[in-house]
């Protein structure tokens, strides 16, 4: 088995799901791959994109939308309650018979998955588009 991860934006309450990018969910499955999850993360964090060679030339508003936010690469074995607010913990406990939440489970249940939006922006790049076209 092993631990599975998601990339979570605490401020926007959004996350990236590695499977959308044809990556595995274990840390080194997506951490060592190119044109996948970490490219999506770079696009979301990019501040000033589109001003030079090597940038993603797209007007997609998701580009840079995570710049400056608190981001966590969180595993499903993560510490309970860590990174969650008191209100988030209380809500979870109320809905789950007192069970302590972790951020991974909370994000899956309550945050927005922006993986497809990030992938659409990535596909504006011809090279990345060709990589995904070959994979299908």
Language-model segment annotations:
Residues 1-22:
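Short, extreme N-terminal segment that most often corresponds to the first beta-strand
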């Amino acid at each position: 088995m092993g631990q599975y991860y998601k990339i979570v934006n605490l401020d926007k309450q959004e996350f990236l799901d590695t499977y959308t990018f044809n990556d595995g969910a274990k840390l080194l499955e997506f951490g060592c791959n190119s044109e996948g999850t970490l490219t999506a993360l770079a696009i979301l964090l990019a501040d000033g994109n589109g001003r030079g060679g090597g940038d993603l030339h797209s007007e997609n508003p998701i580009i840079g939308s995570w710049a400056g936010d608190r981001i966590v690469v969180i595993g499903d074995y993560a510490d309970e309650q860590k990174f969650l607010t008191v209100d988030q913990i209380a809500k979870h406990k109320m809905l789950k018979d007192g069970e302590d939440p972790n951020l991974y489970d909370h994000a899956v249940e309550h945050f927005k998955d922006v993986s497809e939006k990030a992938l659409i922006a990535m596909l504006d790049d011809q090279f990345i588009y060709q990589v995904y076209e070959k994979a299908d």
